[in-house]
């Protein structure tokens, strides 16, 4: 059941890419960042304050808004960073339930729960010449979605690019977005080597990796997170 659903998520991207072209005009609304590659140390998405501890959930209020409000931003960011729009929707849904003012005790802010010294710092180093984002900028929905989507792209195309199976790579991207790549490697695969991680993952089918991340991974929040994001991505496929 899982493999069939997840393969549908991946194959849908080819058809949705044509639809995204019509949203190119919305792209100008994003903060100006030009995708490129450079070498930086792995930075945890949640920052360096408590990387090995379970992460508190954000403050979700009754004021959480409907996802359609952010559709133009999500589609533009999806096209810009070549990340499935359904995945962006799913991450936002699980992270903040589309509440742009959500904030966590772990100092994560906004729709995609961005931290200053995590995803924002990584994206700033790679694409803004090290110019950091202010808290006000991080809370801005357009910038927040741009940062979060850029970070998903970095995980997918830089750190985890040697994972050949696209389905398996996406599962790792989702897990790393939640707990940080170093924690994922350390607690899930007993390594801090990307090459060793690649080898270990190559020994697993996508189904086996899904079980490992959702049933066996020692951080409960991440287990639940991966399962929930995969579930929500399937729901958002036709957005």
What are these regions (language model features)?
Residues 100-102, 122-124:
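Activation segment
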Residues 1-11, 121, 128-150, 154-239:
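Non-catalytic cell-wall polysaccharide-engagement segments
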Residues 82-101, 114-115, 148-149, 173-179, ...:
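Short, functionally critical alpha-helical segments immediately adjacent to catalytic or ligand/cofactor-binding
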